Amino acid sequence: MKHELAGEKIKKELYYAVREIGKEKIQKDISSCIQSSREYIDLLMNKSIDRLISTDQSLDYDRVIGTLSEALLHFMLTISTLPSERKIRLNSELVIDVVIPNLRNLKTNPSKSIIVQFIKQGPELNNVSKLEFIQPNHENIWIVFYRPLSDVK
């Protein structure tokens, strides 16, 4: 299955789970109690993964988790009305997945900006060090990977 096709399938399953619960309910609950976001993240991830794995055993689990995590972050940022920019191509080798609040702010005030990078395959870890050139504050570079980075050789 092509990566784009798998990505669309993953997003479709996520938004199916969102509709089951109710987008407005999720938004209202998170607005009134930010701690509920953790419960919704767990619930949406589990519902989506269960449906994806049960319908297609050939999916690459690493890529499924990475793509699902990224789609879920986009959803959570949107319902929380937090400003962000997505899929910013810096050059032919480096694409930033998410910048909060935006690239302009990252360039002028990196201490007030966060980069979120989703690693869907091990070789993508090689690009992490390149992010440090645009975001000098290491604690403001968040890496999302399906397993602990200490496990990666």
Region locations from a protein language model:
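A short acidic/basic microdomain associated with nuclease active sites
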Residues: 63, 74-98
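Short, surface-exposed basic-aromatic patches at helix termini and helix-loop junctions that form
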Residues: 78, 102-104, 132-137
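Interdomain/boundary linker segments immediately adjacent to catalytic/signaling cores
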Residues: 1-71
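Residues that cap or initiate secondary-structure elements
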Residues: 90, 104-106, 122
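Beta-hairpin (beta-strand-turn-beta-strand) motif
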Residues: 89, 101-103, 148
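Catalytic cores of nucleic-acid endonucleases
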Residues: 111-153
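Active-site beta-strand-loop-beta-strand hairpin of nuclease catalytic cores
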Residues: 100-115
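Short, well-ordered alpha-helical scaffold segments within catalytic/effector domains
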Residues: 70-74, 128
